[in-house]
Amino acid sequence: MGKTDKVVVGLSGGVDSAVAAMRLLEAGHHVEGLFMKNWEDDDTLTHCAAEEDLAEAQAVADHLGIRLHRANFAARYREQVFEVCLREYRAGRTPNPDILCNQRIKFRAFLDHALSLGASKVATGHYAGVGEQGGRFTLLRGEDPHKDQSYFLYTLGQAQLRHSLFPLSELPKPEVRRQAAAAGLPNHARRDSTGICFIGERDFRAFLSRYIQRSPGPMETPEGQVVGEHQGLAFYTLGQRRGLGLGGLPDHDEGAWYVADKDMARNALIVVQGHAHPRLLSTALVADELSWVAGAPPTLPLRCTVKSRYRQQDQPCALEAGPSPTSVVVRFDTPQRAVTPGQSVVFYQGRVCLGGGIIQTRTPVE
């Protein structure tokens, strides 16, 4: 692209997107910002986070001398991300709303809006990269292994990547902070946001219970012994330790308790003791709702590495054709802990992200 072409940067109010915009300006691009409102203020129990974020984004835009556009995608977010997640939680699965948000809001609604403003590219503060050869694009891991966010971007295809820039792809987070402070960016010391995007740092169970009715049932061992009561299967995820309320049970001194499974038919939560309990391990999984960055699946079977959750180390595996034409089987070289239906499994070869899919079922260790 020419440096006179317009790039619209998604300014969130955070330091990453601010430095992304600054680096593009320094490279000579025509840069404008866009602040997305994806969650309605009246749906929060505390202060108005969106107003605070907007104020930070505007301060950054003013400091950089760029225009800041605003767009309200809250209705689309509720329908295409939040309601989808609620359905998944009610079905006993654990969705990843950040991946849905990237797919349906940031790289669809935001991208379309930016193009309508005359942009040729959009940019975000994600720690990932885009490669290009012969008019074909690849999604690359960010250079900083501790911040790489390609896991959350695996649904991006050729149409999105051709219009996308990730200016932080080669930077570690401490360097981003250093550049922000050196440039005097007004939000250089703002701490990173954490938690699920629409929940933030609020209590997960309390927030979700506003939308999903509590449905108590038994907590059981695999042998059928009832050891407690859960508040509703939607509020728990596989591998979870905190919030079970099972500490200090008599005749159970084998260690901490973990969620191992959900019996939806009986509304029973299956729990086990010990971080490495065999019931927490899986030898394989089936994934569908597949997305391939190249636009078409690779030839199977295929040796690659995968992540079945964010921040997991790459796990070597065999990728095979699945039980249906739209699914794949992942066979791990080493059994993996807490493989969770509803979460995403993402496929890699070296630095290149091939794509990924949604975990449907897992094969427990025999």
Swiss-Prot record:
<comment type="function">
    <text>Catalyzes the 2-thiolation of uridine at the wobble position (U34) of tRNA, leading to the formation of s(2)U34.</text>
</comment>
<keyword id="KW-0963">Cytoplasm</keyword>
<feature type="disulfide bond" description="Alternate">
    <location>
        <begin position="101"/>
        <end position="197"/>
    </location>
</feature>
<dbReference type="Pfam" id="PF20259">
    <property type="entry name" value="tRNA_Me_trans_M"/>
</dbReference>
<feature type="binding site">
    <location>
        <position position="36"/>
    </location>
    <ligand>
        <name>ATP</name>
    </ligand>
</feature>
<keyword id="KW-0067">ATP-binding</keyword>
<keyword id="KW-0820">tRNA-binding</keyword>
<protein>
    <recommendedName>
        <fullName>tRNA-specific 2-thiouridylase MnmA</fullName>
        <ecNumber>2.8.1.13</ecNumber>
    </recommendedName>
</protein>
<dbReference type="InterPro" id="IPR014729">
    <property type="entry name" value="Rossmann-like_a/b/a_fold"/>
</dbReference>
<dbReference type="Pfam" id="PF03054">
    <property type="entry name" value="tRNA_Me_trans"/>
</dbReference>
<feature type="site" description="Interaction with tRNA">
    <location>
        <position position="126"/>
    </location>
</feature>
<dbReference type="GO" id="GO:0002143">
    <property type="term" value="P:tRNA wobble position uridine thiolation"/>
</dbReference>
<dbReference type="GO" id="GO:0000049">
    <property type="term" value="F:tRNA binding"/>
</dbReference>
<keyword id="KW-0547">Nucleotide-binding</keyword>
<keyword id="KW-0694">RNA-binding</keyword>
<dbReference type="GO" id="GO:0005524">
    <property type="term" value="F:ATP binding"/>
</dbReference>
<keyword id="KW-1015">Disulfide bond</keyword>
<dbReference type="GO" id="GO:0103016">
    <property type="term" value="F:tRNA-uridine 2-sulfurtransferase activity"/>
</dbReference>
<feature type="active site" description="Cysteine persulfide intermediate">
    <location>
        <position position="197"/>
    </location>
</feature>
<feature type="region of interest" description="Interaction with target base in tRNA">
    <location>
        <begin position="96"/>
        <end position="98"/>
    </location>
</feature>
<feature type="site" description="Interaction with tRNA">
    <location>
        <position position="343"/>
    </location>
</feature>
<dbReference type="GO" id="GO:0005737">
    <property type="term" value="C:cytoplasm"/>
</dbReference>
<keyword id="KW-0808">Transferase</keyword>
<feature type="region of interest" description="Interaction with tRNA">
    <location>
        <begin position="309"/>
        <end position="310"/>
    </location>
</feature>
<dbReference type="InterPro" id="IPR023382">
    <property type="entry name" value="MnmA-like_central_sf"/>
</dbReference>
<feature type="binding site">
    <location>
        <position position="125"/>
    </location>
    <ligand>
        <name>ATP</name>
    </ligand>
</feature>
<dbReference type="Pfam" id="PF20258">
    <property type="entry name" value="tRNA_Me_trans_C"/>
</dbReference>
<keyword id="KW-0819">tRNA processing</keyword>
<dbReference type="InterPro" id="IPR046885">
    <property type="entry name" value="MnmA-like_C"/>
</dbReference>
<dbReference type="InterPro" id="IPR046884">
    <property type="entry name" value="MnmA-like_central"/>
</dbReference>
<feature type="active site" description="Nucleophile">
    <location>
        <position position="101"/>
    </location>
</feature>
<dbReference type="InterPro" id="IPR004506">
    <property type="entry name" value="MnmA-like"/>
</dbReference>
<comment type="similarity">
    <text>Belongs to the MnmA/TRMU family.</text>
</comment>
<feature type="binding site">
    <location>
        <begin position="10"/>
        <end position="17"/>
    </location>
    <ligand>
        <name>ATP</name>
    </ligand>
</feature>
<feature type="region of interest" description="Interaction with tRNA">
    <location>
        <begin position="147"/>
        <end position="149"/>
    </location>
</feature>
